Curated annotation (Swiss-Prot):
GO terms for cellular component: cytoplasm. It holds the Pfam family EF_TS. Belongs to the EF-Ts family. Associates with the EF-Tu.GDP complex and induces the exchange of GDP to GTP. It remains bound to the aminoacyl-tRNA.EF-Tu.GTP complex up to the GTP hydrolysis stage on the ribosome. It is found in: Cytoplasm. Keywords: Cytoplasm, Elongation factor, Protein biosynthesis. Residues 79-82 are annotated as: Involved in Mg(2+) ion dislocation from EF-Tu. Its main location: cytoplasm. GO terms for molecular function: translation elongation factor activity. InterPro entries: EF-Ts_dimer_sf (IPR036402), Transl_elong_EFTs/EF1B (IPR001816), Transl_elong_EFTs/EF1B_dimer (IPR014039), Transl_elong_Ts_CS (IPR018101), UBA-like_sf (IPR009060). It comes from Wolbachia sp. subsp. Drosophila simulans (strain wRi). The lineage of its organism: Bacteria, Pseudomonadati, Pseudomonadota, Alphaproteobacteria, Rickettsiales. This is Elongation factor Ts. Gene3D superfamilies: 1.10.286.20, DNA helicase RuvA subunit, C-terminal domain, Elongation factor Ts, dimerisation domain.
Amino acid sequence: MKMNPDDIRELRDRTGLGLSDCKKALEECDGDIKKAVDKLRTIGLAKADKKSDRVASDGLVAMCLTENCGVLIELNCETDFVARNEKFIELVLNLASIAHQERCTSVDELKNAKYESIGTVQEAIMNGTSVLGEKLELSKLCYLEAKDGVIAGYVHGDVCGLGKIGALIALQSPGDKAKLQEIGKQIAMHIVAMKPEALSIDDLDQMKLKNERSIIEEQVRSLNKPEEVAKKIVDGRMAKYYEEVVLLEQKFIKDDKMKVSDFIKSSEVSAVKLSNYKLLVLGGAN
């Protein structure tokens, strides 16, 4: 049975697999494209499974953002070569869009979401592994929503909305949304650069905080200072520690004469509250 070249082309477009695989699948399925798609998906999954024990340590972070909802995802591959591939970039952007559209709050939710013409997102990722020849892995997802305010974000990279590190922030205010977005983007850029560990002092891990204070107290004790003086030194060093790891206490990257909290207060928009943030670093901890 002679295969229609248009059918072969359509099959390649739908599956991303090679010419010979598509032609063979159509021949075995008597020209039925739907059956051939199912057969090729099985082939693609089998090829992807062979790569499952390989390490995917490169990749991209992608962001999808609207006024009151934002999502960041990380899709990993094995090499920078594939990370710059158009098919990989298209897949990452599609996954971010699906995560945003479906309001996915976890990696598992996104993996089980529908991916048009293929099945699920996880099947699309496995298909990508087969097409690109490297293990692909959806490793992280950050989701933020703001009911009374805006979500702003920033991804540092060469392509709009794609890069190696990104941040989302939630700002609450009844004020001008466009101005809030601009304030939020500047803070998101600060977060990407300074990588804070917590929003406020109260949000710090208490065990880590206790350990840090114990170390500082031990250091100060060796100075043999009077108790009052020693306490002031400890408090001063703790304040310095907060400046390093707490977002609201950090010196604002665009003007180190003020803290991030001061920048928010000085904005033209009234009653602004930074209620939450997310930072996603390629290959970093969740």
